[in-house]
């Protein structure tokens, strides 16, 4: 991922240095496991643990000759050791190291992403509570529907991100597993105890059955889950973009002193952060196809997935980490124009209370079809002539003979839409 959309904490996880360090840890743990089984002298393992070092430049230099990165790596590490070097990579195949270490690196990335998710969820919870009773216009098909509250909107985002967090925790169990089962997965030259020891000490699980590789349905599920999280962010970002339109202006991204919105138009204050999140989400989603096409490998292995994953996994995790952090800050610093929200409710001349009038008539004994046919024409006239809807309702004796002034007051009271907000918040776990 390009530096512009990267945070150092996450980018450092995907460096060659960290990858080789992960490989080395797998190799050393394998030696320790062999030692526990009495196959490698403990003194040799201690020397390997103490003296084995990674030198990325030297490993890459050797790779120019070997054309095999793991062979180059093991030879480079062996250069830092004495006679004990013969135990490095003992009984292992390359993918025992690569796939297990990759899962360990992904675990490191996942630790960061999980913290990102929790921080964002905390911000959403705070916003939901702060604006719990802040009335605003609810819109369906882009058209005014009925009042809701900005807090309910934030509660919706909160519960969606809670689901994303649960899905993420589930996929961690799928993706954070290792395999050290040999060339075709039969443990022909390495006992299962080695795999169990290594994975336990790395803090990851073990695949119950594998070939030379971990099966890539795990990685496809992982990428799809990250893409779904990114898509939720995009959904929220698009909402902010729409609510920041000049004609609506119910929220606005923070605009710093000295910030510029346009090279040509000095007045511009654009939702560029949310637009940025939208674009990043598209990039992340684009990798779903790659992840799924990596699943059908040939027989017990091929490496067609390898080149794709070297690009995909860093890009997706780095981009999502960046997006989560940036969008958390956007929401945290969001300006909310409560007066504009209330004013927008009044823009449609009271039409948004049409269902309240309809239900009131039904409750007084009128047949639904008759009530609907009385209310709808008034709504159409109000929309076309900009006449207050209530005024038209009050001019119809067939309605006023059924509904009293007090009952109409209740129909046109926007606070009615707050009646169940407490219940919604309780159900969302925000009480």
From Swiss-Prot:
<dbReference type="InterPro" id="IPR008948">
    <property type="entry name" value="L-Aspartase-like"/>
</dbReference>
<dbReference type="InterPro" id="IPR004769">
    <property type="entry name" value="Pur_lyase"/>
</dbReference>
<dbReference type="InterPro" id="IPR000362">
    <property type="entry name" value="Fumarate_lyase_fam"/>
</dbReference>
<dbReference type="InterPro" id="IPR024083">
    <property type="entry name" value="Fumarase/histidase_N"/>
</dbReference>
<dbReference type="GO" id="GO:0070626">
    <property type="term" value="F:(S)-2-(5-amino-1-(5-phospho-D-ribosyl)imidazole-4-carboxamido) succinate lyase (fumarate-forming) activity"/>
</dbReference>
<feature type="binding site">
    <location>
        <position position="212"/>
    </location>
    <ligand>
        <name>N(6)-(1,2-dicarboxyethyl)-AMP</name>
    </ligand>
</feature>
<feature type="binding site">
    <location>
        <begin position="307"/>
        <end position="311"/>
    </location>
    <ligand>
        <name>N(6)-(1,2-dicarboxyethyl)-AMP</name>
    </ligand>
</feature>
<feature type="binding site">
    <location>
        <position position="263"/>
    </location>
    <ligand>
        <name>N(6)-(1,2-dicarboxyethyl)-AMP</name>
    </ligand>
</feature>
<dbReference type="GO" id="GO:0005829">
    <property type="term" value="C:cytosol"/>
</dbReference>
<keyword id="KW-0658">Purine biosynthesis</keyword>
<dbReference type="GO" id="GO:0004018">
    <property type="term" value="F:N6-(1,2-dicarboxyethyl)AMP AMP-lyase (fumarate-forming) activity"/>
</dbReference>
<dbReference type="Pfam" id="PF10397">
    <property type="entry name" value="ADSL_C"/>
</dbReference>
<feature type="binding site">
    <location>
        <begin position="93"/>
        <end position="94"/>
    </location>
    <ligand>
        <name>N(6)-(1,2-dicarboxyethyl)-AMP</name>
    </ligand>
</feature>
<comment type="pathway">
    <text>Purine metabolism; IMP biosynthesis via de novo pathway; 5-amino-1-(5-phospho-D-ribosyl)imidazole-4-carboxamide from 5-amino-1-(5-phospho-D-ribosyl)imidazole-4-carboxylate: step 2/2.</text>
</comment>
<feature type="active site" description="Proton donor/acceptor">
    <location>
        <position position="141"/>
    </location>
</feature>
<dbReference type="InterPro" id="IPR020557">
    <property type="entry name" value="Fumarate_lyase_CS"/>
</dbReference>
<feature type="active site" description="Proton donor/acceptor">
    <location>
        <position position="262"/>
    </location>
</feature>
<protein>
    <recommendedName>
        <fullName>Adenylosuccinate lyase</fullName>
        <ecNumber>4.3.2.2</ecNumber>
    </recommendedName>
</protein>
<comment type="subunit">
    <text>Homodimer and homotetramer. Residues from neighboring subunits contribute catalytic and substrate-binding residues to each active site.</text>
</comment>
<comment type="pathway">
    <text>Purine metabolism; AMP biosynthesis via de novo pathway; AMP from IMP: step 2/2.</text>
</comment>
<feature type="binding site">
    <location>
        <begin position="67"/>
        <end position="69"/>
    </location>
    <ligand>
        <name>N(6)-(1,2-dicarboxyethyl)-AMP</name>
    </ligand>
</feature>
<dbReference type="GO" id="GO:0006189">
    <property type="term" value="P:'de novo' IMP biosynthetic process"/>
</dbReference>
<keyword id="KW-0456">Lyase</keyword>
<feature type="binding site">
    <location>
        <begin position="4"/>
        <end position="5"/>
    </location>
    <ligand>
        <name>N(6)-(1,2-dicarboxyethyl)-AMP</name>
    </ligand>
</feature>
<dbReference type="GO" id="GO:0044208">
    <property type="term" value="P:'de novo' AMP biosynthetic process"/>
</dbReference>
<comment type="function">
    <text>Catalyzes two reactions in de novo purine nucleotide biosynthesis. Catalyzes the breakdown of 5-aminoimidazole- (N-succinylocarboxamide) ribotide (SAICAR or 2-[5-amino-1-(5-phospho-beta-D-ribosyl)imidazole-4-carboxamido]succinate) to 5-aminoimidazole-4-carboxamide ribotide (AICAR or 5-amino-1-(5-phospho-beta-D-ribosyl)imidazole-4-carboxamide) and fumarate, and of adenylosuccinate (ADS or N(6)-(1,2-dicarboxyethyl)-AMP) to adenosine monophosphate (AMP) and fumarate.</text>
</comment>
<feature type="binding site">
    <location>
        <begin position="268"/>
        <end position="270"/>
    </location>
    <ligand>
        <name>N(6)-(1,2-dicarboxyethyl)-AMP</name>
    </ligand>
</feature>
<dbReference type="InterPro" id="IPR019468">
    <property type="entry name" value="AdenyloSucc_lyase_C"/>
</dbReference>
<dbReference type="InterPro" id="IPR022761">
    <property type="entry name" value="Fumarate_lyase_N"/>
</dbReference>
<comment type="similarity">
    <text>Belongs to the lyase 1 family. Adenylosuccinate lyase subfamily.</text>
</comment>
<dbReference type="Pfam" id="PF00206">
    <property type="entry name" value="Lyase_1"/>
</dbReference>
<feature type="binding site">
    <location>
        <position position="276"/>
    </location>
    <ligand>
        <name>N(6)-(1,2-dicarboxyethyl)-AMP</name>
    </ligand>
</feature>
